[in-house]
Swiss-Prot record:
One term under GO cellular component: cytosolic large ribosomal subunit
Basic residues: bias regions: 10-21
Pfam families recorded: Ribosomal_L18p (PF00861)
Provenance organism: Thermosynechococcus vestitus (strain NIES-2133 / IAM M-273 / BP-1)
Protein name per UniProt: Large ribosomal subunit protein uL18
Binding partners and assembly: Part of the 50S ribosomal subunit; part of the 5S rRNA/L5/L18/L25 subcomplex. Contacts the 5S and 23S rRNAs.
Stretches for region Disordered: 1-25
Amino acid sequence: MKQTRTAARQSRHQRIRRKVKGTSDRPRLAVFRSHQHIYAQVIDDTRHHTLVAASSLEPELRQKLGKGSTCAASIAVGRLIAERAKAAGIERVVFDRGGNIYHGRVKALADAAREGGLDF
């Protein structure tokens, strides 16, 4: 029986998570992409604690962008997560694409986070 798209993404994400772990020295930058929005979190997996978060749902971004499902929204979220991470003293992260293909909105967020100063 064929898996649904969501189930296939979740199984890919579990496979990735077995290898990608965030530490306090190098936390994990986790990306979740829904149909309408994109979310990013910097997570310390040893303490199970979210250090920094940003999404296209935030009021300041929603006013500027309108739709949260575009590459422009992903770029804005990537810049915002990098800015917040730098303010929290985080410079190096491990990228977790969340089972999504590294293309389009996920790639745009990653590139913007790199341009913002995060190293991964």
